[in-house]
């Protein structure tokens, strides 16, 4: 079920403070808050999202508003299925 509209979008307040303080800066903003919703104030900023191991820099554009930060930094790596072992013999 989607979140109630009367509650509004969820975002971590410390992330918004970082975005507002880095208004003219080109350095990426590091965050572990994958659960925060992208707000219009974040458009144009580069946010480095933690995936559990590394930080992945993501440039925020207008199409991303309303989505969560975690959607743009995958946490699992798919190595592919094993090939057919019989064909090598």
Curated annotation (Swiss-Prot):
<dbReference type="InterPro" id="IPR005732">
    <property type="entry name" value="Ribosomal_uS19_bac-type"/>
</dbReference>
<dbReference type="GO" id="GO:0015935">
    <property type="term" value="C:small ribosomal subunit"/>
</dbReference>
<keyword id="KW-0689">Ribosomal protein</keyword>
<comment type="similarity">
    <text>Belongs to the universal ribosomal protein uS19 family.</text>
</comment>
<dbReference type="GO" id="GO:0000028">
    <property type="term" value="P:ribosomal small subunit assembly"/>
</dbReference>
<keyword id="KW-0687">Ribonucleoprotein</keyword>
<dbReference type="GO" id="GO:0003735">
    <property type="term" value="F:structural constituent of ribosome"/>
</dbReference>
<dbReference type="InterPro" id="IPR023575">
    <property type="entry name" value="Ribosomal_uS19_SF"/>
</dbReference>
<protein>
    <recommendedName>
        <fullName>Small ribosomal subunit protein uS19</fullName>
    </recommendedName>
</protein>
<dbReference type="InterPro" id="IPR020934">
    <property type="entry name" value="Ribosomal_uS19_CS"/>
</dbReference>
<dbReference type="GO" id="GO:0005737">
    <property type="term" value="C:cytoplasm"/>
</dbReference>
<dbReference type="GO" id="GO:0006412">
    <property type="term" value="P:translation"/>
</dbReference>
<dbReference type="InterPro" id="IPR002222">
    <property type="entry name" value="Ribosomal_uS19"/>
</dbReference>
<comment type="function">
    <text>Protein S19 forms a complex with S13 that binds strongly to the 16S ribosomal RNA.</text>
</comment>
<keyword id="KW-0699">rRNA-binding</keyword>
<keyword id="KW-0694">RNA-binding</keyword>
<dbReference type="GO" id="GO:0019843">
    <property type="term" value="F:rRNA binding"/>
</dbReference>
<dbReference type="Pfam" id="PF00203">
    <property type="entry name" value="Ribosomal_S19"/>
</dbReference>
């Amino acid at each position: 079920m989607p979140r109630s509209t009367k509650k509004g979008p969820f975002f971590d307040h410390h992330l918004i403070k970082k975005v507002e303080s880095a208004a003219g800066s080109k350095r990426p903003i590091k965050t572990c808050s994958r659960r925060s919703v992208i707000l219009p104030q974040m458009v144009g900023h580069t946010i480095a999202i933690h995936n559990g191991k590394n930080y992945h820099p993501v440039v925020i554009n207008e199409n991303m508003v309303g989505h969560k930060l975690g959607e743009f930094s995958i946490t699992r790596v798919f190595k592919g299925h094993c090939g057919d072992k019989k064909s090598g013999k």
